[in-house]
Amino acid sequence: LQNQPIYLKAITLKDISDVDSIKDDAKKHMILIVRITPMAQKDIETLRKAIDDLYNFVKSAGGDIARLGEERVVITPPAVKIWKGVHDLK
């Protein structure tokens, strides 16, 4: 790895407008832990669209994305891969 540190940031996805700031942080090669509960409680369909958008963005940038239980999603830069066991859901 490079001499630059990789930062870990926890964010809450409250609204579809938060997706752009999450993408900006992902472009900075941060590891992001995104709490999705507030949006899930408001509008599950909008949450699905937001997650699909983030999934496509992260994959096209060479990063990785996975669920962390029911309440969180983790996003990693290209240099960090997420181990997904056989029982993990996509």
Locations of regions flagged by a protein language model:
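Ordered, soluble secondary-structure elements with a strong preference for glycine-centered loop motifs
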Residues: 12-16, 41-48
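Anion (oxyanion) recognition and catalysis
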Residues: 26-27, 59
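Residue-level signature of catalytic and energy-coupling elements of molecular machines
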Residues: 54
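A generic structural signal for short beta-strands and their flanking turns/coil linkers
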Residues: 7, 28-32, 71
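Short hinge/gating elements
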Residues: 34-41
